[in-house]
Amino acid sequence: MKKKILISVGMAALFLCASWQEAETTVSPDRLFLADNGKSLFVTNRAGCELIKMSPDGQKMEKKVSFSSPVNAMTQDANGKLRVVCDGNYGTMYELDGKKLSVQSKIKSGATPSDILYNPLSKSLWVTQRFNNELWEIDPATRKVKTKIAVGREPVSMAAFAGDSCLLIANNLPEMPSTAYHPE
């Protein structure tokens, strides 16, 4: 029987910082993302505006892709496509091939996208717009905004719960959590 060890995100980031070496490059791990049902680890390099896929043991970079500005968030759909949002240059959403880590398309996604989530029930992408104080529902096939919902002040993060039927939106300024319900 294999034992599973849970490492807090803070400890994992410290582990990566201590073991990560790349000649003559500034690397500043900022965010961690899991994909492929927890089998793939991605790390953002804020200084280099990169998304890096790490080896399963976390010791080596397998692949990396560069963007026009730092990556704020990442999600993966049921088909394995990755999508990331970057807030520079008036906000961009990139669609990536999950295996090759190559950019398939990019679109403007609001001025300040701070988080992105794929919802399997609505088959939509949900993007928080930090300084617009909104949650956007985007159709992945057409890449068009379907719905805009006001959600308090500076939404920075979200999490699905109740079997993906609800979203909890975390706001940055004063304690104002909001809940947005997904249409089924």
Predicted features along the sequence, with ranges:
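Sec-dependent N-terminal signal peptides
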Residues: 5-14
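Predominantly soluble domains enriched in secretory-pathway, periplasmic, or organellar proteins
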Residues: 14-184
